[in-house]
């Protein structure tokens, strides 16, 4: 046990006030949760780059997200990006989880949101939705 489920959730999806404030500001005037989801994921897709240096220096499994670095540099790896995206979605009342597992055989992290009983997957690294098989290992 890594400090209980609450501790793990706080480590993998920490509250980060600047990102949460940005999410609320972006979503002012949004009429639905789906519209908020689309605004946040578009913002992340448009503003955040993949950090190839961090990708080769972080442990392949067991690394932790660095949301402050992500926010300041506008870049991160899948874990950083998914973690902060979940935090931004939750800040605007969208139920969302950070998923860690496998995507087409590669260790990966992505976002799962639930809106109106429907599941939405967001994967910054796969904007064309080419990944055919996601397999959950952990969820936060």
Predicted regions and their residues:
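Short, aromatic- and glycine-rich surface loops/edge beta-strands on solvent-exposed regions
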Residues: 1
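Secondary-structure boundary elements
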Residues: 6-76, 84
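Hydrophobic/aromatic-rich core segments of domains that either
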Residues: 81-140
